[in-house]
């Protein structure tokens, strides 16, 4: 069974959309293997998004991700990475499929409700960035 990382970003946390977003994941057959709310430090946000360090939007992304608490979770299920990506929708909410999380709750490319791992390899890296192995349960057991 695959695992992937999902982050409910500060905009969605601030607008009390956590329950609605979690419900979308669960109704699609993804289970929560770990979840916590954190307020990222500058160092944590920069480390997590280090792959984008040279991109022009990097500082804006970091500033946004530290602007309020986020909910980080490990989603588990069949094809979890691809299913999560499909549920999230396109990065730009205006291009996201109707009914997708970003179409429902996103405002712009930068303020787009959620983050999700883009590959199995990155999912493993991202999950370990936020969670120790002992914090993750087998949600399908």
Curated annotation (Swiss-Prot):
<dbReference type="GO" id="GO:0006228">
    <property type="term" value="P:UTP biosynthetic process"/>
</dbReference>
<dbReference type="InterPro" id="IPR036850">
    <property type="entry name" value="NDK-like_dom_sf"/>
</dbReference>
<dbReference type="InterPro" id="IPR034907">
    <property type="entry name" value="NDK-like_dom"/>
</dbReference>
<keyword id="KW-0547">Nucleotide-binding</keyword>
<protein>
    <recommendedName>
        <fullName>Nucleoside diphosphate kinase</fullName>
        <ecNumber>2.7.4.6</ecNumber>
    </recommendedName>
</protein>
<dbReference type="GO" id="GO:0004550">
    <property type="term" value="F:nucleoside diphosphate kinase activity"/>
</dbReference>
<dbReference type="GO" id="GO:0006183">
    <property type="term" value="P:GTP biosynthetic process"/>
</dbReference>
<dbReference type="GO" id="GO:0006241">
    <property type="term" value="P:CTP biosynthetic process"/>
</dbReference>
<feature type="binding site">
    <location>
        <position position="112"/>
    </location>
    <ligand>
        <name>ATP</name>
    </ligand>
</feature>
<dbReference type="InterPro" id="IPR001564">
    <property type="entry name" value="Nucleoside_diP_kinase"/>
</dbReference>
<comment type="subunit">
    <text>Homotetramer.</text>
</comment>
<keyword id="KW-0479">Metal-binding</keyword>
<dbReference type="GO" id="GO:0005524">
    <property type="term" value="F:ATP binding"/>
</dbReference>
<feature type="binding site">
    <location>
        <position position="9"/>
    </location>
    <ligand>
        <name>ATP</name>
    </ligand>
</feature>
<comment type="similarity">
    <text>Belongs to the NDK family.</text>
</comment>
<feature type="active site" description="Pros-phosphohistidine intermediate">
    <location>
        <position position="115"/>
    </location>
</feature>
<feature type="binding site">
    <location>
        <position position="57"/>
    </location>
    <ligand>
        <name>ATP</name>
    </ligand>
</feature>
<keyword id="KW-0460">Magnesium</keyword>
<keyword id="KW-0963">Cytoplasm</keyword>
<dbReference type="GO" id="GO:0046872">
    <property type="term" value="F:metal ion binding"/>
</dbReference>
<feature type="binding site">
    <location>
        <position position="85"/>
    </location>
    <ligand>
        <name>ATP</name>
    </ligand>
</feature>
<keyword id="KW-0597">Phosphoprotein</keyword>
<dbReference type="GO" id="GO:0005737">
    <property type="term" value="C:cytoplasm"/>
</dbReference>
<keyword id="KW-0808">Transferase</keyword>
<dbReference type="InterPro" id="IPR023005">
    <property type="entry name" value="Nucleoside_diP_kinase_AS"/>
</dbReference>
<comment type="function">
    <text>Major role in the synthesis of nucleoside triphosphates other than ATP. The ATP gamma phosphate is transferred to the NDP beta phosphate via a ping-pong mechanism, using a phosphorylated active-site intermediate.</text>
</comment>
<feature type="binding site">
    <location>
        <position position="102"/>
    </location>
    <ligand>
        <name>ATP</name>
    </ligand>
</feature>
<keyword id="KW-0546">Nucleotide metabolism</keyword>
<dbReference type="Pfam" id="PF00334">
    <property type="entry name" value="NDK"/>
</dbReference>
<feature type="binding site">
    <location>
        <position position="91"/>
    </location>
    <ligand>
        <name>ATP</name>
    </ligand>
</feature>
<keyword id="KW-0067">ATP-binding</keyword>
<keyword id="KW-0418">Kinase</keyword>
């Amino acid at each position: 069974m695959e695992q992937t990382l999902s982050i409910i970003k500060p905009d969605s946390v601030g607008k009390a959309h956590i329950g609605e977003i979690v419900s979308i994941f669960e109704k699609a057959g993804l289970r929560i293997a770990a979840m916590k709310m954190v307020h990222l430090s500058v160092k944590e946000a920069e480390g997590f998004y280090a792959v984008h360090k040279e991109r022009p939007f990097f500082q804006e992304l970091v500033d946004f991700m530290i602007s309020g608490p986020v909910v980080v979770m490990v989603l588990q299920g069949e094809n979890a990475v691809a299913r999560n990506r499909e549920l999230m929708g396109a990065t730009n909410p205006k291009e996201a499929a109707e009914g997708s999380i970003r179409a429902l709750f996103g405002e712009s490319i930068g303020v787009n409700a959620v983050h999700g791992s883009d590959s199995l390899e990155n999912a493993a890296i991202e999950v370990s960035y936020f969670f120790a192995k002992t914090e993750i349960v087998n949600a399908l057991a």
